[in-house]
Amino acid sequence: MDIREVFARNLRRSRQTKGLSQEALAHEAGIDRTYISALERSQYSASISTVDKLATILGVEAADLLKRPAKAPRAAKT
């Protein structure tokens, strides 16, 4: 999973957890809804300032939007 996919997944999850629509998030961030949609579909890469702005609105750290999911531990072979 590349960093755009990681960001897309975390952005969507954080937005939904906060209970915001793409439209509401875009309005608060001062950007277009279609840009939020494209970010959530891994179509565009966000600038550092956009990542920071979105994180602030979502109430998370910017780094949280870039964190890869933890890998599940593998079951030991018997």
Predicted regions and their residues:
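Residues within helix-turn-helix
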Residues: E23, T34, D52
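A detector for short, charged/polar N-terminal pre-domain segments
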Residues: M1-V6, P73-A76
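Short basic helix-loop element that most often maps to the first helix and adjoining turn
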Residues: R9-E28
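Conserved hydrophobic/aromatic packing and binding residues within compact polymer-binding modules
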Residues: L11, L25-A26, I36-L39, L65
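Short, charged recognition helix plus adjacent turn
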Residues: D64-T78
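Recognition helix of helix-turn-helix/homeodomain-like DNA-binding domains
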Residues: G30-Y44
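DNA major-groove recognition helix of helix-turn-helix/homeodomain DNA-binding modules
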Residues: S49-D64
